[in-house]
Amino acid sequence: CDEENASILSDTIMRAERDGSVSHGLFRLPAYVSGLVSKKINGKARPELQNVAPSIIKVLGNNAVAPMVLSLGLPAVIDLAKKNGVAVLAITNSHHMAALWPETEAIAEAGLVGIACTSYKPAVAPAGATKALYGTNPISFAWPRPGKTPVVYDMATASMAMGEVQIAKREGHKVPLGTGLTKDGKETTDPGEIVDGGVILPFGGYKGSSIAMMV
């Protein structure tokens, strides 16, 4: 992993840990290291920016970690939005999106409204089902407030982020009923039964399920 990639990734981990998002802080470090060792993550990647349309840009991640990709794409999409009034940034071939709020917050701090979302590998069963179809598919929103900090939220469309379930398993905590199902499709408060072959449920039943589908 070269210095630029390492610096950007470590800053992302530090900010998540600082802001209390334990599931996206130091907890993620072993997975990042494993990805670098296995070559799933290109630690020397240089993402490429492409202009798709007047208000649409795309960044080819080249298997970089997402914060590295966003370091190129975020300033570009902010400039484009200020020029055209609206802009869209699409990201492909990046590894693990990390938390979304640092990016939407940066957009709001630039005086713009930001919305971000990402899909992920299946871990969440649709409402009424017992098999995974959706990822935890988070969505984040930020709104600027002149002279004040922006209004920002970042949430999984699952009942709980996968990282939070994994941390609960590691620390021996129970999770609320309704968080997920066992591999046999039964409700459980044991995070281990969810992580090891089970599924997470969407938040709010069919409402969260529909938002996950949209993402």
Say what each PLM segment does.
Residues C1-L9, R15, V22-K40, I167-K169, ...:
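Acidic, glycine/proline-rich low-complexity segments that act as flexible tails and inter-domain linkers
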Residues N5-L9, G25-R28, Y32, V69-V77, ...:
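General structural feature for long, well-ordered alpha-helical segments within catalytic domains
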Residues H24-I78:
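Active-site cofactor/substrate anionic-group-binding motifs, chiefly glycine-
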Residues P54-I56, V86, G198-I200:
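Short, solvent-exposed beta-strand edge segments and adjacent coil->beta transition regions
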Residues I57-P146:
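A generic, well-ordered mixed alpha/beta core segment in the N-terminal half of proteins
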Residues A123-E193:
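Phosphate/diphosphate-binding glycine-rich loops and adjacent basic-rich segments that engage nucleotide
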Residues G197-V215:
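Internal helical hairpin/lid segments
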